[in-house]
């Protein structure tokens, strides 16, 4: 029989083993589509971002007008920018659902895959933050000022660190230049980390909704999941294009239509919607260093989840108490997101503090306890 180039060629066989002949569990649901959707998001963002970078000028005097020029005078520039800005939102929707899936079905027990995933999330957050500064509108400028200023809470070296990051004594031209450089670089770092993430995943194979070993019942990735993924792409790209074409500014802040002005502070400084939950946790502690630590902990707590798994079963599929707790956590995150968008006044302050406390209590205390309790219930 003639050798199959797909299986013998050094490069093609890597593609083959990852995307074609990969053994996949036969029962993985649509919740397993988000990994490939994140891949499409990354490709779309890099492509649109590259096209935008060709028309962008990273200079405080020109940045705002270069973005306006792109939207007005470049062929389909408005579309490219709208796809890029809203693509970021879809990227975060997909990654949050992807993490939620991993949490629900116990996928975090693949520790290397999970940890590289958390690093990917942190890198994505950094990329989105520096990218938001580039149009150099009011919210870009003040968002950059507020968030970079948080590093000054670090004892002893804080202030030096902030001035080093700024390249001066305030957010100014050097800051914008380096943020553009970082925003160009980080997505390629994300692409590299994604390959590491997939390498670790393919060592163990995918988890499945039952949380049990599925080696006895595997099916090839192609054609089954290639087709299913293409359906997923269509179902994601449809709302993305709808949003970009019909209401591109729905998720943005009107304040960013005003060019950056260091002398005028916007009435409510707030980040894009996908950072609001963390912003609410930051604001809920009336102390700068404490708030910064809580902000960091809100994401870094994900590194601890594999060690807090006390249940004998992997997935929550047959654990109703953990399921209830999981959905309370989801509701709690929605509350945090909403509180983060509100001004700092009564009753939002106390709601934010309670929601922040609940967030950490559920993740660090209640989940392990309920897991252990469910183990006991298995005996009855």
Curated annotation (Swiss-Prot):
Localization annotation: Mitochondrion inner membrane
Tagged with keyword Repeat: no
Superkingdom in the source lineage: Eukaryota
InterPro entries: Cyt_b/b6_C (IPR005798), Cyt_b/b6_C_sf (IPR036150), Cyt_b/b6_N (IPR005797), Cytb/b6-like_sf (IPR027387), Cytochrome_b (IPR030689), Cytochrome_b_C_euk/bac (IPR048260), Cytochrome_b_N_euk/bac (IPR048259), Di-haem_cyt_TM (IPR016174)
Binding site for a ubiquinone: 202
Gene Ontology CC annotations of this record: mitochondrial inner membrane; respiratory chain complex III
Keywords: Electron transport, Heme, Iron, Membrane, Metal-binding, Mitochondrion, Mitochondrion inner membrane, Respiratory chain, Transmembrane, Transmembrane helix, Transport, Ubiquinone
Keyword Chaperone: no
Disulfide cross-links: none
Cofactor: heme b
Single GO term (MF): metal ion binding
Residues that span the membrane, as ranges: 34-54, 78-99, 114-134, 179-199, 227-247, 289-309, 321-341, 348-368
One Pfam short name: Cytochrom_B_C
A GO biological process held by the record: mitochondrial electron transport, ubiquinol to cytochrome c
Chain sites annotated for binding heme b b562: 84, 183
Topology of this chain in the membrane: Multi-pass membrane protein
Cofactor note: Binds 2 heme b groups non-covalently.
Main location: mitochondrion
PANTHER family: CYTOCHROME B
Function in brief: Component of the ubiquinol-cytochrome c reductase complex (complex III or cytochrome b-c1 complex) that is part of the mitochondrial respiratory chain. The b-c1 complex mediates electron transfer from ubiquinol to cytochrome c. Contributes to the generation of a proton gradient across the mitochondrial membrane that is then used for ATP synthesis.
Family: Belongs to the cytochrome b family.
Miscellaneous comment: Heme 1 (or BL or b562) is low-potential and absorbs at about 562 nm, and heme 2 (or BH or b566) is high-potential and absorbs at about 566 nm.
Subunit structure: The cytochrome bc1 complex contains 11 subunits: 3 respiratory subunits (MT-CYB, CYC1 and UQCRFS1), 2 core proteins (UQCRC1 and UQCRC2) and 6 low-molecular weight proteins (UQCRH/QCR6, UQCRB/QCR7, UQCRQ/QCR8, UQCR10/QCR9, UQCR11/QCR10 and a cleavage product of UQCRFS1). This cytochrome bc1 complex then forms a dimer.
Name of this chain's protein: Cytochrome b
Species this chain originates from: Puffinus nativitatis
Gene name of this polypeptide: MT-CYB
């Amino acid at each position: 029989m003639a050798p199959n180039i797909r299986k013998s060629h050094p490069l093609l066989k890597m593609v083959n083993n990852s995307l074609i002949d990969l053994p996949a569990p036969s029962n993985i649901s649509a919740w397993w589509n988000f990994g490939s959707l994140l891949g499409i998001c990354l490709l779309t963002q890099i492509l649109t971002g590259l096209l935008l970078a060709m028309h962008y000028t990273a200079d405080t005097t020109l940045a705002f007008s270069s973005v306006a020029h792109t939207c007005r005078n470049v062929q389909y520039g408005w579309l490219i920018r709208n796809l890029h800005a809203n693509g970021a939102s879809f990227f975060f929707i997909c990654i949050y659902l992807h993490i939620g899936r991993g949490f629900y079905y116990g996928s975090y027990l693949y520790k290397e895959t999970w940890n590289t995933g958390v690093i990917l999330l942190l890198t994505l957050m950094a990329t989105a933050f520096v990218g938001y500064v580039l149009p150099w509108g009011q919210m870009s400028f003040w968002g950059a000022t507020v968030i970079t200023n948080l590093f000054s809470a670090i004892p002893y070296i804080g202030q030096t660190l902030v001035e080093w990051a700024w390249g001066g004594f305030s957010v100014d031209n050097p800051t914008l230049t380096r943020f553009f450089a970082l925003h160009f670089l980080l997505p390629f770092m994300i692409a590299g980390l994604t390959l590491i993430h997939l390498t670790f995943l393919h060592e163990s194979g995918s988890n499945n909704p039952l949380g049990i070993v599925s080696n006895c019942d595997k099916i090839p990735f192609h054609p089954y999941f290639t087709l299913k993924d293409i359906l997923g792409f269509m179902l994601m790209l449809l709302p993305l294009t709808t949003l970009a074409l019909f209401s591109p500014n729905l998720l943005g802040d009107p304040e960013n239509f005003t060019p950056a002005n260091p002398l005028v502070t916007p009435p409510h400084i707030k980040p894009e919607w996908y950072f609001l939950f963390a912003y609410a946790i930051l604001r809920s502690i009336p102390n700068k260093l404490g708030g910064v630590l809580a902000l960091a902990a809100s994401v870094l707590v994900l590194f601890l989840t594999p060690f807090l798994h006390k249940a004998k079963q992997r997935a929550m599929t047959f654990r109703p108490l953990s399921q209830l707790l999981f959905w309370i956590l989801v509701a709690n995150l929605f509350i945090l997101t909403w509180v983060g968008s509100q001004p700092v006044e009564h009753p939002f302050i106390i709601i934010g503090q309670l929601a922040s406390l609940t967030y950490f209590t559920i993740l660090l205390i209640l989940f392990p306890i309920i897991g252990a309790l469910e183990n006991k219930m298995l005996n009855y």
